[in-house]
Amino acid sequence: MGIEDINRRLRQLKKKRVDASIRNRKEAASEERARLAEGKPRVYSMAEEPADEAEADDTQSEQLKLLNYRIADYEKWDEKQKRHKQPSDGADLGELANSTYRSELHQLHRRGVVKGRATNGRISASGKVVLDDEPELVEKLAAAVQQTAKRRHEERQKKAAKDGGRATAGSLNDKNRHFNEKLDREFRKRGQ
């Protein structure tokens, strides 16, 4: 494939691009003319629509709404879902601690403890802002985290007692727990 073939292919692609943009502009203009020809939107009309038309319009508007959903909006929504997702029983304890900490900070803000307070900040020699922690807020946060940790520990102990003393950390369900126990037995056999 020589340079001439590549140039010819490039010209063809450019022509297709121009044709597509012209078609797109024509279609957009015809849609605009059709919208203007309809006059007022149906929302302002006092005429009652048949139920089938209204339902069809609802599904069509829902489809248009989904088509106009941007990737950035989805990523923001996904991040929000990840932040609010509660870890499962077998979750990593580091994730659980992080989730608890974030949740308690959020609760402090919601209760208005932090809202409206003057910050005790100063600017260091390097030009960075240094904020001094307020002892009462630190104490409240520590107490809330300890209370949550104690409650979760008690729940785990109750669950372990209910299961007959078997460890449930890291098990998603009974079948998974049985599999993990079988793996443990195999590792002990091979280790001896």
From Swiss-Prot:
GO terms, biological process: mRNA splicing, via spliceosome
Q: State the family it belongs to.
A: Belongs to the SYF2 family.
The entry's keywords: mRNA processing, mRNA splicing, Nucleus, Spliceosome
- Role played: Involved in pre-mRNA splicing.
Location of region: Disordered: 16-62, 76-108, 148-192
Record bears the keyword Transport? no
Source organism of the structure: Eremothecium gossypii (strain ATCC 10895 / CBS 109.51 / FGSC 9923 / NRRL Y-1056)
Kindly provide the name given to this protein in its UniProt entry: Pre-mRNA-splicing factor SYF2
Write out the biased-composition intervals (Acidic residues). 49-60
Q: State the compartments where it is located.
A: Nucleus
Q: Which residues form a coiled coil?
A: none
Q: Which residues cross the membrane?
A: none
**Organism superkingdom:** Eukaryota
Which stretches are tagged as biased composition: Basic and acidic residues? 18-41, 152-165, 174-192
How is the quaternary structure described? Associated with the spliceosome.
Point out the gene that encodes the protein: SYF2
Q: Which GO terms describe its cellular component?
A: cytosol; Prp19 complex; U2-type catalytic step 1 spliceosome; U2-type catalytic step 2 spliceosome; U2-type post-mRNA release spliceosomal complex; U2-type prespliceosome
